[in-house]
From Swiss-Prot:
This is Gamma-glutamyl phosphate reductase. Its main location: cytoplasm. It comes from Streptococcus thermophilus. CDD domains: ALDH_F18-19_ProA-GPR. Pathway: Amino-acid biosynthesis; L-proline biosynthesis; L-glutamate 5-semialdehyde from L-glutamate: step 2/2.
Length: 416
């Protein structure tokens, strides 16, 4: 039996044991985990410091190091996220529909757990606890495989959760942690059809593509965000400037940060020079511009074709000038990763056309793409942002981690 087989078997057994946990029992456990995270924060910080030291030694960028870092505020935020999940309505057992058919059969469709969820993710250690809390709230066992960069932090966080489970008399195997960060083990998890009911990859384009190519278990694709801001010819340019600055600079290393700016030709001569000046007062951003934009920006560099398809996760932004709304929509649909896209305009009909025609999970009018988030959308913590169309799309909250089952009650009916 391989390492993944052992984890999978333990998770499968655990999933059956926790399947009938009551809402009260689940909420109590989650609140205990939240308390334990704060109480054991010194242990977590010690382990996180090891990851930070390794990151510095390995030349990982400051932006990516920020994703790794755990502070008192961030631990408090993670704990609060767990408490918020405890406060959310429990979807398990909810009736989706119920009716009596022509044969007199009483048919009820209810929400039920998936079973065993596996998650492969990169860098941000908070993901481990977010994923656990959502999986546990929906009576699912979860197998977590984080990246090498955050191995010590992830292990510490999962250790705290497992200890809380054990103290509550619940099997600690409800959350499994993959300590082997090799690609071989990750790929073995991708094909563990005997144990895994759903695999969720959360990370960069390379990870997502690998999972799409090699997975045999059901997958929900998440994460990659080549997000665009389109500044229309009818935009309020001051508003557009603030939206672009926020979407690009507030936290560039996350998937809902803007990576590409598309500007209508009618306002480009006024907008781009002013944007460049305004953003430079806050943060140095490298603009990689097409030929028309390049002439209007003092410090921009020429964009390569690849730049328009790149999720930079850095203070870098591609710039494209278009002559019409239709051209903007076609351009975005060519390069989008179907995550989050935005238009800035005062024209309602153009805004509606953009929202209808752009193919993305979240499409904004006059707002930053940075709002695509489970908490902001009122879903509680999210396990990821789905960029596909099957089963779940956009921020994935509790319902996305459930399946349904039909309960049919009869009185001796047979089919003629």
């Amino acid at each position: 039996m391989t390492y993944v087989d052992t984890l999978g078997q333990q998770a499968k057994v655990a999933s059956r044991q926790i399947a009938k946990l009551s809402t009260a029992a689940k909420n109590d456990l989650l609140n205990q985990v939240a308390k334990a995270l704060v109480a054991e924060s010194d242990y977590i910080f010690t382990e996180n410091a090891k990851d930070m030291a390794n990151a510095s030694e390995n030349g990982i960028s400051k932006i990516m190091q920020d994703r790794l870092l755990l502070t008192e505020d961030r631990i408090a935020g993670i704990a609060e996220g767990v408490r918020q999940v405890a406060d959310l309505q429990d979807p398990i057992g909810q009736v989706v529909r119920g009716y009596t058919n022509l044969d007199g059969l009483k048919i009820v469709q209810k929400r039920v757990p998936m079973g065993v969820i596996a998650m492969i993710f990169e860098s941000r250690p908070n993901v481990s606890i977010d994923a656990f809390s959502l999986a546990f709230k929906t009576n699912n066992a979860i197998i977590l495989r984080g990246g090498r960069d955050a191995i010590n932090s992830n292990k510490a966080l999962v250790t705290v959760a497992r200890k809380a489970l054990k103290n509550a008399g619940i099997t600690a195997d409800a959350v499994q942690f993959v300590e082997d960060t090799s690609h071989e083990v990750a790929e073995e998890l991708m094909v563990a059809t005997k144990y895994v009911d759903l695999l969720i990859p959360r990370g960069g384009a390379r990870l997502i593509q690998t999972v799409k190519e090699k997975a045999k278990v059901p997958v929900i694709e998440t994460g990659v965000g080549n997000c665009h801001i389109y500044v229309d010819k009818y935009a309020n340019l001051d508003m557009a400037t603030q939206i672009v600055i926020n979407a690009k600079t507030q936290r560039p290393s996350v998937c809902n940060a803007a990576e590409s700016l598309v500007v209508h030709a009618d306002i480009v001569e006024e907008f781009l020079p002013n944007l460049e000046k305004a953003i430079s007062k806050i943060q140095s951003v490298e603009f990689r511009a097409d030929e028309r934009a390049l002439k209007l920006m003092e410090k921009a560099v020429p964009a390569s074709p690849e730049d328009f398809a790149t999720e930079f996760l850095d203070y870098i932004m591609s710039v494209k000038v278009v002559d019409s709304l239709d051209e903007a929509i076609n351009w975005i649909n060519t390069y989008t990763t179907s995550h989050s896209e935005a238009i800035v305009t005062q024209d309602i009909s153009r805004a509606e056309q953009f929202q209808d025609d752009v193919d993305a999970a979240a499409v904004y009018v006059n707002a930053s793409t940075r709002f695509t988030d489970g908490f902001v959308f009122g879903l509680g913590a999210e396990i990821g942002i789905s960029t596909q169309k099957m089963h779940a799309r956009g921020p994935m909250g509790l319902e996305a981690l459930t399946s349904t089952k039909f309960y049919i009650n009869g009185q001796g009916q047979i089919r003629e």
